[in-house]
Each structure stands twice: as structure tokens, then as C-alpha cells.
Amino acid sequence: MKKTDRIWELDALRGLCILCVILIHLIFDLIYFIGLDLYLPAWYVFVQQYGGVIFVVLSGCCATLGSRSFRRGCIVFSCGMLISLVTFGMYRLGMASRDVIVWFGVLHLLGVCMMLYPVYKKLPTQALAAVGVALVVTGYLISGTVVEAKFLFPFGFVYEGFTSSDFFPILPHLGWYMLGTVLGRTVYADKKTDRKSVV
């Protein structure tokens, strides 16, 4: 997709999601690190609960419009690992409690989703939608399942005492990402926006 053919509504929605994430983390930092007793507006709870899913769906939609998904996924996942390293360092240095560590956040998730996209991108749209729904349902069914193994948390299986200040497990979120790619295939099949709708 050429730079001049960017889909404005997707850029606007992603920008809004990023702005909301920044505000969410700012409020969290003011409460957690500075100790301010702040009133949490209604939109805070909404964004905290649903903003991540919306952003993942949008990212899946955008995956159908670009290229080099695997390479970009590696970069995004590396950024997620850097955040894990920094937050773990903050804990080890006594700057914050263990709860601040990001073990598998949104950047880890998006990186994995982007790297996996070339594997399933050739699936028929209906099959992709079915797999996406199945992963979403499975993810919510296993949500909060406690297991003894400590290496399954990226898939949503947590161990006793597990905490992560930002947690986006592969299940159900890979399913939401796939449904986003279905949205991209259907709504933006020609990889451009309908400019007449905003004139």
C-alpha cells in the first residue's frame, strides 16, 4: 500500500487507542509510583477492559494491508522483551514491587501475532473466521486456569502467584487478531478507504 493510500479511519482509531493507553499508564503511574488518590473516570474502566481487544483487532485488520509482517513482528516482540527487562530490573533494584514486571504484554502479543500471520494468511476467509472464534472462545474458557508449569503463561495458563502489570495472553487474543484480519479482508478488500463516505 502506498503512503498516499493510507486508510485514514484506521490510522485515527489506532492513534486514539495509543492515546488512551498513554493516559491509562499515566494515571497508573501517578497512583502506583507517586501515590496520588485520583478519581478514575468511567472511560478509564472501559479502555482498561476493552481497549486492548479493540487495538488487537485493528492491528489484525492492518496486517492485511501491509507486508513484511514477520520482520515487523520480530521488532515489536523485541520491544516487548526490552520492556520485560526494564521492569524486571526495576524490581531487582528495589524501585518497584514484583507486580510491575511485564511478563507478556501487548507488544509481546502483537509481535507473536505478526510473526504467525504468514503461516495462516492463505487460509480462506471463512476458515480464518472460524479459527479466530474458536481461539477466542477457548481463551475465555481457560482464562485464569492455574497450572503447575511456569512456562505456559503466554498461552493464558497461569501459575499460583503469577502477576504481570500488562498481560495479553495468546489465547484469546490471537483469535481477536485473526478476526481483525477477516475484517481487513472484507471491509478493505481493495486496500483503500471509501473517501466518498466522508465527503
Model-derived regions: residue spans:
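Alpha-helical transmembrane segments and their immediate juxtamembrane cytosolic regions
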Residues: M1-V199
